Amino acid sequence: MISFIVPSYNNLQHLKNVYASIQKHEPQAEVILLDDGSTDDTWKWIQEQDCIKYRSETRVGHTILYDKGIELATNDIVGILHADMIVGPNYVANLVKHLKPKTVVCATRIEPPLHPEGKEKIIRDFGMDFDTLDIKSFEDFVNELQLVEGQTTRGMFAPWILYKEDFQAIGGHDPLFAPFPYEDSDIFQRWIMAGYELIQSRDAFVYHLTCRGHRWNEQVGRDDDYYKTVSQRAARNYLRKWGSWIKNDELQYPIINPKYNIAYVIKACNLDLLSALEPWCDMIYIEDEMGVLQAAYYETEQRNTSYDLKKRVLTIEYNDPKAENDIVVEFDAKQFTQQSYNIIQQLSEILKESGEVGEFEVDVFKITINSLTEYQNDLIVCNN
């Protein structure tokens, strides 16, 4: 009836716990365990289990492995789980009762006090690591909650389930964000724009230790160096794709800003400012007749993105920004301040609320609007 996809990287003890919880509460479920190039005994242990198995010889990240697992799934309904989660009683039943085509249903997380509180989750300490879990107390707590819970709210976070064909209809996760993170915020927005309903079941529960699968592999509460590197890269690619940063309401339901075609025209630009601003626009025009600044930027940044930076970073001398773009933002780098940067970060919201065709000035910017065409719907289907 349902297939669970569980990737893991060097998280064998956590993986054993989540697998045991599935076997206990959902023994009929199909389980797909995927080893992300682990260097511990993860793959050896996976091979001993009665499940669908897959191994990547190198670390590719859960952005890729979720999709591989869903490809391997033989059931119509698929769901993901993190290796550092355990499922509670009645987990599948309390998700599936809300499921229909073009719907994504997520569970409610119960987490130890490691992160700020939120209305989309419950903070309760049932153990801080794989070897201190109080599973009986967690299950008793879930059984108590299920006597009174039952409603839904509108929000989205892992773990979730949906129909396999609905997942594949929009092309799955975008490998632009491999290995991780931000692939989740990207696909949540694409689901909404594709017309899917996002529901959170308030009586389907997991206990989630948080961040052990990809962020805190070495020490709880401290980001791994690898995570810092790939997180920065993914964040810059998210901005290139969407033109604005992630925004959610208090229940973690995505708030989607318009995606406009925006170009910056910068006088006296330097390499640091080019690096800071290039992801926030579609095209950036600089004074660089000899191409020295462009070449230096390509050398350091092109390896971090599948976007062709030679099509994004252009010279003022050989191009006509106003003829090539819907919205053109002109300014002098010497006048650019932190306040200016704050405006850049909010520009899509400013344009949505008060933009109109014509010219206007704000802070150090001269803004020319030729069109307010929105392009976010072009991002729904991932064809990579």
Give residue ranges: language-model regions.
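A conserved hydrophobic helix/loop-capping motif in glycosyltransferases and polysaccharide synthases
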Residues: I2-H14, V18, H25, L34, ...
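Short, acidic, metal-binding catalytic loop of nucleotide-sugar glycosyltransferases
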Residues: A20-A29, A276-M283
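A conserved acidic beta->alpha catalytic loop
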Residues: L34-K44, T58, D288-Q294
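Glycine-rich, basic loop-to-helix element that forms the pyrophosphate-binding segment
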Residues: S56-A73
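Short aromatic/hydrophobic "clamp" motif used to bind/position activated sugar donors
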Residues: V78, V328
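Donor nucleotide-sugar recognition loop
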Residues: I86, T153-P159, Q168-V206
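Conserved donor NDP-sugar-binding/catalytic core segment of glycosyltransferases
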Residues: I86-D129
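A recurrent flexible, glycine/aromatic-enriched loop bordering the glycosyltransferase active site
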Residues: F141-E165
